Amino acid sequence: MSSSDIFDVLNIKQKSSSPNAASPSVPASGKSSKPQLTGMQRELYNLLGENEAPVVVQSMNRFKEKLASNAKPTPWSLANFKANEYLTLQHWVKGSRELIGEEPQESEFKKYDVHLTIPEFTEDEYNSFIPTSNAEENEKQNIGEKVEANGDSTDVNMTEEDTNDKVKESVPQDENKSTSDNKKNNEKWEYNEVKYLFDLCKKYDLRWFVIQDRYDYENSNRTLEDLKSKFYEVSKCYFKAKKPDDPMLQSLNYSKDKETQRKKYLERLLARSAAEIAEEEALIIESRKFEMAAKKTLAERETLLRLLDSPQSDISVAQYLTSNGMSQLYNSLLADKSRKRKIDSAVPENPWMKQQHQFAQQRQQMQQLQQKKLEKHDASATPGPATTVTATETSTNVTSAGSIPSGLQSPKKTKRQKLELQTALKRKSESEYAEQLLKIFNMDERKSLGVIAHGEKLSPGVFLRSAKITTFKPAIQNKIISTAQELGIPARPVMPTFEVVTEYEALLKKIATLLDIKKQIDKIEAGKQITK
């Protein structure tokens, strides 16, 4: 479909009245010929009509422009170089032949061809430092034999059964010693073989598997461990003869028995069957389960110990019964929720260590009291100048008691314990002050009149004593009420006097602790049944 067809469909008149008047072969003189466009199909280009194409992508294949430089090119020449003492190679070098010269140069990469420093020695040197090491080993063996002989002489007074048992045990030991001696005799090394081993180590840079593969000295069957042990033994003797106090001698220790045992263990590990591997994996999973259960029980035990050791809260609930108190409680809870919690990573206190510290404190206090009593008795028995002596003794005792470690005097207390101690001291002082005011009343008069010395600050206004009974969480509260009903105790005391309310609160707290202990015991028994 051409552009004229589209104009006919859309009823658009073309600008030229006679389109076929001008022949396509004769171009107009005034108009320039359009360049032939590539990258677009002819039919699509004809649809554009007289309008020009917006953007036409034309592929222009161009090579990189030639670098215009007037510099003279540097010559390169093929020169010889020494790869090693026995091999000469060629490579291209920047520069002319006159500058390089005809003699082969050393390679630039020779500095990277680094080898290990293996000790070298002659036969005389080898015979000089090897017998000294053998003599030291013989002396150690003689000392061990003497110690064993002394031990045998001390054990003369033994029964016949013990001697028979020792003889039975010594027989395999003697057999093992004889086999080891035979092995040592069979493993004798000469200088030529040692020199051959050190040459291989120097050639292959202590690559032991390659050394064992290339090792072929008079058809000797040496294992990898034999080669290693001999190499490190001779190296240690060599460096020890040169510098006996060298701290690096410990790095040349090599245990052949441990290495063979390690390889045996590894072979046994790799030779396991699929059933054995599955059984081991099952055992590992079970052990991890036991570890997780043990950690969980330890955490629960710690929480239980904290619960038993922590003091019971005596805060009254009456301040939260009003609307103002409820709003304050709501705001404090919101602030507490928005505050970031610090992770308490401290190790929990061990109750047994705490008890031991308390026992140590009590023991020290008892000793101090006994010393004071003795000093008083001595002072009453010897009046006069002896009193000065007792005073000095008491001062020395006080100083000695003060020099006791702080860990035994008083264990470290947390912030919470310090605050509780401060509040307890404050209440005690307030109660003592109230007792001073109520000295004029007897106990009977106090009971009859209902006069009580409160240690804590009371909330203003009139309130019921039964409203001040401490409450617990809903789940715990329901359990406490059900246990109290089983025991025949009402949910609220009938006559809520001061003494009845205090005893009732103590009873509720005891029931709560017993319920928590029962819960922990049930968990422990369930864990025991699972382990069985």
Swiss-Prot record:
> Where does this protein have compositionally biased stretches of type Polar residues?
30-39, 402-411
**Transcription as a keyword?**
yes
| Record key words, sorted | Activator, Chromatin regulator, DNA damage, DNA repair, Nucleus, Transcription, Transcription regulation
Q: Which residues form a coiled coil?
A: none
Q: Which residue stretches does the UniProt record annotate as biased composition, category Basic and acidic residues?
A: 137-149, 164-184
Q: How does it assemble?
A: Component of the SWR1 chromatin-remodeling complex and of the NuA4 histone acetyltransferase complex.
Organism the protein comes from:
Candida glabrata (strain ATCC 2001 / BCRC 20586 / JCM 3761 / NBRC 0622 / NRRL Y-65 / CBS 138) (Yeast)
Q: Name one GO biological process term.
A: chromatin remodeling
> What Gene Ontology molecular-function terms does this entry list?
transcription corepressor activity
Q: Which cellular compartments is it found in?
A: Nucleus
Note whether ATP-binding occurs among the keywords: no
Region span, Disordered: 13-39, 132-184, 363-417
Per the record, where are the segments of Low complexity compositional bias? 16-29, 380-401
Quick one: where is this thing mainly located?
nucleus
**Residue stretches making up the SANT domain:** 181-235
Family membership: Belongs to the SWC4 family.
Give a Gene Ontology cellular component term annotated to this protein.
NuA4 histone acetyltransferase complex
Q: What is this protein called?
A: SWR1-complex protein 4
Q: Which InterPro entries match?
A: DAMP1_SANT-like, Homeodomain-like_sf, Swc4/Dmap1
| Highest taxon listed in the record's lineage | Eukaryota
Record's function text: Component of the SWR1 complex which mediates the ATP-dependent exchange of histone H2A for the H2A variant HZT1 leading to transcriptional regulation of selected genes by chromatin remodeling. Component of the NuA4 histone acetyltransferase complex which is involved in transcriptional activation of selected genes principally by acetylation of nucleosomal histone H4 and H2A. The NuA4 complex is also involved in DNA repair.
